[in-house]
From Swiss-Prot:
It comes from Pyrenophora tritici-repentis (strain Pt-1C-BFP). Residues 23-62 are annotated as: Disordered. This is Lipoyl synthase, mitochondrial. Residues 1-30 form a transit peptide. [4Fe-4S] cluster 1 binds at C132, C137, C143, S378.
């Protein structure tokens, strides 16, 4: 019986295999491939060349990696004054907010700085408050962390850390019945200033409408104790309006203070919308004028915030009123919203406009004007200039035109600090 081959293997027999001749017809080319022969360009070993694109050209013309990691990289004029906005919030409820301009950004305070740590330690040990912390001043890292301890500055706030008024721009705590005055505060303040060894100090106060004298005698006692511990110490006081009681303003003026400062904060038109209802533009002018009348040699000073919606005519009017009341020094700074509970910023004023108003104030006859986005009531260039003027007066030098002539030199000193 013949052996039968399995059916499944029949397909593998040689009789069933057919040789298919290789086609000599050329393969069909793809539509994107050119039929013309391409000449190959020799490439550099280890490097592939890519054709340039508009995207790569844009990247090459833009900022480099160093521009992103270097915070001090210079900006173009267009970028420097550009106001940027951003959309925040959940979908359907997004709102547009304005980002902080480049010229208003400041370094974060660091405890690594020895001067910063020492000043903070002294203040805590003596139970003293500063307006630097309470008002969230943007210059605290510069003032508390000066190049040397003598160059560091802290503005001490007297009569506690709670104010009886509620201005719409201010971050200081408010209460109708703040804690009573600390009877040891004058001595503690004088001792802290003696430890620091500063030549020029700034003291500010909260408004205390709950006190019969608005705290005038407490302030005067503090200044006198400071002078007792260091007779050459120059003291600037940034005080309130004492509820319109001009006699209390004169009590402070007679205490031995060297610079009598009281801020009008804004223009007369905007005062009812910016300051507490008990603070009035004319009342502030009366306080400054009465201090000058009590002591004609006293330097009087005030400060204004820009960016609240004021017009040029509003500012001209305010400056004319200040000169009519013999105010010597004026400063301009940008209003910066402390929290969302406070009034919003109307606009961010450019550094060029601040410089313009500085020149205008000097042309009107002010002894000194500090003007800039980050300038506050206590400003180092202003302190350096006023300190120089006061020392010359003590030596019997004239302080009129010579003081103004030394303005630029004093500003350089302030920048160096």
């Amino acid at each position: 019986m013949a052996t039968s081959i399995p059916r499944s293997r029949c397909f593998l027999t040689s009789s069933t295999l057919k040789v298919v001749p290789r086609s000599r017809t050329p393969l069909r080319s793809f539509a994107t491939t050119s039929d013309t022969p391409q000449t190959s360009v020799p490439e550099a070993p280890g490097k592939r060349s890519r054709p340039p694109t508009s995207f790569s050209d844009t990247l090459n013309a833009g900022p480099s990696f160093g521009d992103f990691v270097n915070p001090n990289a210079p900006l173009s004029p267009t970028e420097a004054y550009e106001i940027k906005t951003v959309q925040v919030g959940p979908e359907g409820r997004k709102k547009t907010i304005t980002r902080l301009p480049e010229w208003l950004r400041t370094p974060i305070p660091s405890n690594a700085n020895q001067n910063y740590k020492q000043i903070k330690k002294d203040l805590r040990g003596l139970n003293l408050a500063t307006v630097c912390e309470e008002a969230r001043c943007p210059n605290i890292s510069d003032c508390w962390g000066g190049s040397s301890k003598s160059a560091a500055t802290a503005t001490i706030m007297l009569m506690g850390d709670t104010c009886t008024r509620g201005c719409r721009f201010c971050a200081v705590k408010t209460s109708k019945a703040p804690p009573p005055l600390d009877p040891h505060e004058p001595e503690n303040t004088a001792e802290a200033l003696r430890r620091w060894g500063l030549g020029y100090v700034v003291i500010t106060v909260v408004d205390r409408d709950d006190l019969a004298d608005s705290g005038a005698h407490h302030i005067a006692e503090t200044i006198m104790k400071i002078k007792q511990k260091n007779p050459t110490q120059l003291v600037e006081l940034l005080g309130g309006d004492y509820g319109g009681n001009l006699e209390m303003a004169k009590v402070v003026a007679r205490s031995g203070v060297d610079v009598f400062a009281h801020n009008i904060e804004t223009t007369e038109r905007l005062t009812p919308f910016v300051r507490d209802r008990r603070a009035k533009f004319r009342q502030s002018l009366d306080v400054l004028r009465s201090a000058k009348e009590e002591r004609p040699e006293l330097i009087t000073k005030t400060s204004m915030m820009l960016g609240l919606g004021e017009t040029d005519e509003d500012l001209w009017h305010a400056l004319r009123e200040l000169r009519a009341n013999n105010v010597d020094v004026v400063t301009f700074g940008q209003y910066m919203r402390p929290t969302k509970r406070h009034m919003a910023v109307h606009d961010y004023v450019t550094p060029d406009k601040f410089e313009l108003w500085r020149q205008r104030a000097l042309d009107m006859g002010f002894l000194y004007c500090a003007s800039g986005p980050l300038v506050r009531s206590s400003y180092k260039a202003g302190e350096a200039f006023i300190e120089n003027v006061l020392k010359k007066r003590r030596l019997g030098s004239s302080a009129g035109k010579n003081d103004v002539a030394e303005l630029s030199a004093a500003e350089e000193v302030g920048k160096a600090l």
